[in-house]
């Protein structure tokens, strides 16, 4: 059954739903295999990771915490995705260093404390380049500071507009 979602957590939730359905069947509830499969197929993707298009590959992810960034990187690495550009628009400086580090290494701040072997800029990563944009209602000076922080982890560039970032990301892609 093709699932409407990506990621380990969503797949785990699907497995729990199947097991719960089977447990109810053992308690004499009438749930057919077809009903379980139809239910899985009908699930709407409410996760932050969304594939917008396949060619070129465009993924929209609303991640903004180190934990969400690490989860996104795990999904991309599991799918063996490489040579992507990321467009990032953060509204706060607090936690930005941990966010960029997690997006680079796949490790949350807690995991990074345990694993000292990962140095910034040395990890295999799906992102060839990241473009930073200023979200509406956010100060451009903040995005300038965030771009400097991002440069410790990625080839990072500040863009004046989202349209400019999309144009540059598309021009930079090495994917079909």
Residue ranges and their predicted role:
Residues 1-129:
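Nucleotide phosphate-binding/pyrophosphate-handling subdomain across enzymes
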